[in-house]
Amino acid sequence: MKAILWCNGANPNSSILDEVLSNDAEVFGVDGGADKAAEEGVVVSEILGDLDSVDITRWEGRVTELIDQNNSDLAKAIGVLTDRGYTEIDVIGTEGGATSHVLGNWAALCDAPSGARIRIHHNDSVTSRFHPDDGEMEFLVGEGEVFSVFALLPGKVWISGA
């Protein structure tokens, strides 16, 4: 199953929206990201978060409050979707705002349980999370394309053909 998490940062550009929204995935708002998605005309199935930045009056019956203040709304939302069986999660709306939120987004990838391929879509690139418990993964990069590999936790990486 595929899901999109729309965060409360700057709205993604049209090319990201075209790419991600065409994947027949269910859209979830991460707190105030639900309002931003709705403003773009996107149907949001459910709001996930601590609800501190969303107008919950417009979302009656589609709100799941995630109270744990030890984790970010994004980390909690990824955990909920993984528990529900989603195996592909695209995250959008993460650009802009405080620089610390960038680190928080990557930390959410580290904290997320195994079982789902997670991608954060930036205006100029995509961050893909590969969890070591998910087994071997292959990531193909086209000739001449720029890529980077960073291990946020201990792991093993083999690169060939670069």
Can you annotate each of these PLM segments?
Residues 1-58:
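N-terminal beta-strand-loop-alpha-helix module at the start
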Residues 34-37, 54-56, 98-99, 124-129:
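Short gly/pro/ser/thr-enriched loop/turn and capping motifs at secondary-structure boundaries
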Residues 38-40, 82-85:
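Non-catalytic positions within long, well-ordered alpha-helices that form the structural scaffold/packing
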Residues 63-83:
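Short phosphate-binding loop-to-helix
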Residues 99-111:
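Short Gly/Thr/Asp-enriched flexible loops that form oxyanion-binding sites at enzyme active sites
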Residues 113-128:
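Short, acidic/small-residue loops that bind anionic groups at enzyme active sites
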Residues 125, 130-162:
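Long, charged alpha-helical interface segments
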